[in-house]
């Protein structure tokens, strides 16, 4: 073994000893309530395909037509010759759906966060993030070079204290522009499933003259009128400067997006490096996402959304989303719990550090509209055995 591989092997061994080593599992089926892994079929309670659209005939037909007309790849970045019609159609559909002036799509939600935050902020600016925001937002905040402050999860008092500090430290210096203050939160948090107090955050951002960026990845398609998200449901979407999200969760496709003003989108086209220097996404995925947005605004889409909420309430009336965390704490015990569930043909992976903080390992249950009453009951019964 080379010195290089030997060093990495030692690091992997350390992860194993801490119960933190992960592995890829090959899935030999489409996403759905049942998936095939290692020749065995499991009930799947781990997918973000909340509305069961990833394998829906409507999306597959749209993707196939896009492949037939536009091929398998865009072949270049959007600013060269890769700005194919499906991307423009998707962005127009997204902007109309979110009731914003414009939208811009990225290859992933991660790329959307990195590109947007790093384009908007520099070393003289201030970024304030919720403690539990997605890793892409944390990484973007660090890469931007802006002064980073973190407020305790959904803690408005802590947020205001930081905003007071930021307000004092954002005054324009001689020859320099005023420092901007950007608050970033998720609307529905990816690992805990709880909701941000967006109305109150909007009040604070207006009070201190800050900008607000809201990641609606786990709310889009599920919450609000026609699934427009939590900001729309709470009546504050017009006061959110930057709406971010993904196309690979409830929408069943792939990619990330930013919705906002026309000026914002034009600025990102010129300054977001993850957009400028990436080959455009797959046109088939864009076409599928457009079909998904059109579907979720239809009567059948509303019925699908209502079915999801029926499944959530069947499991428990207290949850605010399709994400249900089963907190265990210890990493090794969490892995053992996931293994025990697989023995009952139920697939729920152990979520451990660095996805969540040390000592907060959990099983992250996700429910979808594709699950049946019987399957949710099977899940409930299986979870009871963990305490037996």
Residue ranges and their predicted role:
Residues 244-246, 250-319:
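PLP-dependent aminotransferase class I/II
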Residues 8-10, 14-70, 210:
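N-terminal "arm"/small-domain region of PLP-dependent enzymes with the aminotransferase-like
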Residues 149, 153-214:
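Active-site phosphate-binding strand-loop segment of PLP-dependent enzymes
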Residues 209, 229-247, 266-270:
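Conserved active-site segment immediately N-terminal to the catalytic lysine
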Residues 57, 61-65, 69, 96, ...:
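PLP-dependent enzyme catalytic core of the Aspartate aminotransferase-like
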Residues 304-345, 355, 359-360, 367-369:
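Conserved PLP-binding catalytic core of the aspartate aminotransferase-like
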Residues 61, 65-109:
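Conserved N-terminal alpha-helix of the aminotransferase class I/II PLP-enzyme fold
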Residues 116-135:
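Conserved PLP-anchoring active-site segment centered on the Schiff-base-forming lysine
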């Amino acid at each position: 073994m080379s010195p290089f591989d030997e060093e990495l092997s030692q690091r992997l061994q350390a992860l194993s000893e801490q119960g933190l080593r992960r592995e890829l599992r090959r899935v030999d089926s489409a996403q759905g309530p049942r998936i095939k892994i290692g020749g065995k079929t499991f009930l799947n309670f781990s997918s973000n395909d909340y509305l069961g659209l990833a394998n829906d005939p409507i999306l597959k037909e749209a993707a196939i037509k896009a492949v037939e007309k536009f091929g398998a790849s865009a072949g270049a970045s959007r600013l060269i010759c890769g700005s194919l019609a499906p991307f423009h159609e998707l962005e127009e559909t997204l902007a109309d759906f979110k009731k914003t002036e414009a939208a811009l799509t990225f290859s992933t939600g991660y790329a959307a966060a990195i590109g947007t935050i790093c384009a908007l902020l520099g070393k003289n600016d201030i970024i304030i993030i919720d403690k539990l925001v997605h890793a892409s937002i944390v990484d973007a905040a660090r890469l931007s070079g802006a002064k980073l402050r973190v407020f305790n999860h959904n803690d408005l008092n802590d947020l205001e204290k930081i905003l007071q500090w930021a307000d004092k430290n954002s005054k324009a210096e001689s020859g320099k522009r005023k420092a901007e203050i950007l608050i970033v939160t998720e609307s529905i948090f990816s690992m805990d499933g709880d909701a941000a107090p967006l109305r109150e955050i909007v009040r604070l951002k207006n009070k201190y003259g800050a900008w607000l960026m809201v990641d609606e990845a786990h709310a889009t398609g599920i919450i609000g009128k026609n699934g427009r998200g939590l900001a729309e449901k709470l009546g504050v979407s017009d006061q959110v400067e930057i709406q971010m999200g993904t196309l690979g969760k409830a929408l069943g496709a792939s990619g990330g997006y930013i919705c906002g003003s026309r000026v914002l989108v034009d600025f990102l086209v010129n300054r977001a490096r993850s957009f400028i220097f990436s080959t455009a996404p797959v046109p088939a995925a864009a076409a599928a996402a457009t079909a998904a947005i059109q579907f979720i605004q239809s009567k059948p889409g509303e019925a699908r959304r209502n079915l999801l909420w029926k499944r959530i309430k069947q499991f428990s009336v207290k949850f605010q989303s399709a994400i249900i965390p089963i907190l265990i704490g210890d990493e090794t015990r969490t892995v053992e719990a996931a293994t025990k569930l697989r023995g009952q043909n139920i697939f729920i992976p152990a979520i451990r550090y660095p996805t969540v903080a040390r000592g907060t390992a959990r099983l992250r249950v996700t429910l979808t509209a594709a699950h049946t009453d019987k399957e949710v009951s099977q899940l409930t019964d299986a979870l009871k055995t963990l305490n037996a």
